[in-house]
């Protein structure tokens, strides 16, 4: 896939899937701007903007400045997200609200600042990263799953609103992926193997392909959906989970 000369924005680009996606776009020739609350490396092969996606005023300020400096935004990837674990009746109000503020509100803020640009240029692609937790309930993940389900609905609604302008909007829903977020759930030396086998007591199936996804595998799907190879694909949600949701 060739993104030479394309202008691409990726949120959550400091680490994990967002970082892998930003790198993949750079390797494909794109001019990439990555957004995150913090960037811990001294150097990155793409432009970086420190920004809290949950802060609407900050998002507006940064996006308006960047859009004034460019003629076209070819692709937007909403990959910023957080995970707060806890049973529904034990989860703090703060954790619930913060999860929605970042996972749903963050994308909403980016949509609000970029939709007019996409309409004016009559083209482009948006890929939003949800989760297989939006498809299958998980014990202790009510906030995360609910936020990702809301995010999916939001992204597809935006896709319908922009379709008449030739803008494609799709969703990628990863399963367990080898990121810092995933590793916070691993509390034993064999946690990865346990996840692959599944947790019957939690009604959580294993992974038929027998492995945890690599961030690059999620990034590959994102790049495909943003590319001309997917020129007639919009309003779709591709689950990349090694089969763990059994197509649910």
From Swiss-Prot:
Superkingdom in the source lineage: Bacteria
Coiled-coil residue spans: none
Activity regulation note: Inhibited by cis-2-hydroxy-3-cyclohexen-1-carboxylate, cis-2-hydroxycyclohexane-1-carboxylate and trans-2-hydroxycyclohexane-1-carboxylate.
Family the entry assigns: Belongs to the short-chain dehydrogenases/reductases (SDR) family.
SUPFAM superfamilies listed in its UniProt record: NAD(P)-binding Rossmann-fold domains
Protein name (Swiss-Prot/TrEMBL): 2,3-dihydro-2,3-dihydroxybenzoate dehydrogenase
GO cellular component: cytosol; protein-containing complex
Catalytic activity: (2S,3S)-2,3-dihydroxy-2,3-dihydrobenzoate + NAD(+) = 2,3-dihydroxybenzoate + NADH + H(+)
Factors inducing expression: Under conditions of iron deficiency and by the fur protein.
InterPro entries membership: DHB_DH (IPR003560), NAD(P)-bd_dom_sf (IPR036291), Sc_DH/Rdtase_CS (IPR020904), SDR_fam (IPR002347)
Purpose: Involved in the biosynthesis of the siderophore enterobactin (enterochelin), which is a macrocyclic trimeric lactone of N-(2,3-dihydroxybenzoyl)-serine. Catalyzes the reversible NAD-dependent oxidation of the C3-hydroxyl group of 2,3-dihydro-2,3-dihydroxybenzoate (2,3-diDHB), producing the transient intermediate 2-hydroxy-3-oxo-4,6-cyclohexadiene-1-carboxylate, which undergoes rapid aromatization to the final product, 2,3-dihydroxybenzoate (2,3-DHB).
Residues at which substrate binds: 131
Pathway: Siderophore biosynthesis; enterobactin biosynthesis
Annotated residues for binding of NAD(+): 9-33
Enzyme Commission number(s): 1.3.1.28
Molecular function terms, GO-annotated: 2,3-dihydro-2,3-dihydroxybenzoate dehydrogenase activity; identical protein binding
Subunit architecture: Homotetramer; dimer of dimers. EntA and EntE interact together.
UniProt entry keywords in alphabetical sequence: Enterobactin biosynthesis, NAD, Oxidoreductase
